[in-house]
Amino acid sequence: MAQTNPKVQTLIDAIPYFKKFYGKTIVIKYGGSAQTSDDLKEKFAQDIVLLTLLGIKPVVVHGGGARITELLNKLEIPSSFVDGYRVTCKESMRVVEMVLSGEINKNIASLLNFHGAKAIGISGKDSGIIKAVPKDGGKFGYTGDITSVNGELINNLIKEGFIPVIAPIANGDEANHPGFNINADVAACEIAMALKAQKVIFLTDTIGVLNKSGELIQTLDKANVEMFKKDGTIAGGMIPKVDSCIEAIHNGVNKAHIIDGRVEHSILLELFTSDGIGTQFIRVDNPNNGIDIEKLLNKQD
C-alpha cells in the first residue's frame, strides 16, 4: 500500500485543529524580541494571514520594549524596570507612544496588508478602547493598570473582516492626559478576556518558562506559578507574562501559551500540531483544557 506523502500527511494531521479553531478568536502578543529580523517578521505575517484563510480570527497586540529602550538611550532619557514593568516618566511616555503607535503599529499593519490581510492598526487610546489608571498609585509614573477594554468595538472590527493590530497605550480619565504605557503582556491578557478568546499566545525570545536547570516547563497552573515565583524560578520580565496567562485562563480564556517567537512559524506549530511548543497554562478544573489531569499531577509530584 502506497504511503501518504509526508507533506499531505502533515495537512491531514492538522485537520482536527482546523476544525477546532474555526471561527474562534486567538489573541497574539507579538513581542519586540520576536520582531528582530525581517525574515521572522515575514513568517509571522504569513502565519497571521493563514489563520484568517482558515476562518480563525486573530487579534495582534504588540510590544516594542527593545526599540523604546534604544530610543530613550539615544535621547538620554533615563529608564528603569521594577518586576518587569517599565517606570515611565512624562518624557518617556512621549517616546513610548511615538514608537508603539506611530512606528511599530503601522509597520505591522502594513506588513500584514502586504501579505493580503485586511489589518487595521489602532492605539488603545482610539475611541477609548483601553482605559487605565496609574499603576500602584503612580509608583510607576505613566505606566498604567487597565480598568476597561472596549471588546465590543474590537469585535465590530473583526466582524467587518479586519485584523485588529493594537498598540498598548491607554487613555486616562483627565482631559489632555498624555496617556498610559501599558505592559503589552497585560494588554494582551485583558483584551483576550474582553473578547472571551479561545487562546492567548505570547511570542517571546525564550522557548517558554524554564526551570532552574534551564529545561522547558511544558504545563503550568496557578499553584505551580505561585511556587515558582516564590523560589525565584520565575522572575523579572517573565513575571508579567505568567501573571497575565494565569489571569486570562481564570477569566474566560480557555488556554494561554508562552512560545518562542524566534522559531519560524511558531504560531502554526503551537496551534496545528499535537505536541505544540512552549509552555501552556491551564486551569486544572477546566474540563475543556484537553489535559489528562491525573497524569499532569503525577508528573508534578
Curated annotation (Swiss-Prot):
Recorded catalytic activity of this chain's protein: N-acetyl-L-glutamate + ATP = N-acetyl-L-glutamyl 5-phosphate + ADP
Matching InterPro entries: AceGlu_kinase-like_sf, AcgluKinase_fam, ArgB, Asp/Glu/Uridylate_kinase, NAGK-C
Q: Which UniProt keywords apply?
A: Amino-acid biosynthesis, Arginine biosynthesis, ATP-binding, Cytoplasm, Kinase, Nucleotide-binding, Transferase
Q: In which pathway does it act?
A: Amino-acid biosynthesis; L-arginine biosynthesis; N(2)-acetyl-L-ornithine from L-glutamate: step 2/4
Transmembrane stretches, start-end: none
GO terms of biological process kind: arginine biosynthetic process via ornithine; L-arginine biosynthetic process
* Any GO molecular function: acetylglutamate kinase activity
The subcellular localization recorded is:
Cytoplasm
Cite the binding residues for substrate: 64-65, 86, 181
Q: In this UniProt entry, which residues are annotated as the site Transition state stabilizer?
A: 29, 241
Q: What general EC class does the enzyme of this chain belong to?
A: transferase
| Domain of life, per lineage | Bacteria
**Gene Ontology CC terms:** cytoplasm
Q: What is this enzyme's EC?
A: 2.7.2.8
HAMAP family given for it?
Answer: ArgB
Give the family from UniProt.
Answer: Belongs to the acetylglutamate kinase family. ArgB subfamily.
**Role according to the record:** Catalyzes the ATP-dependent phosphorylation of N-acetyl-L-glutamate.
PANTHER family linked to this entry:
N-ACETYLGLUTAMATE SYNTHASE, N-ACETYLGLUTAMATE SYNTHASE, MITOCHONDRIAL
Protein's name in the database: Acetylglutamate kinase
Tell me what organism the protein belongs to.
Aliarcobacter butzleri (strain RM4018)
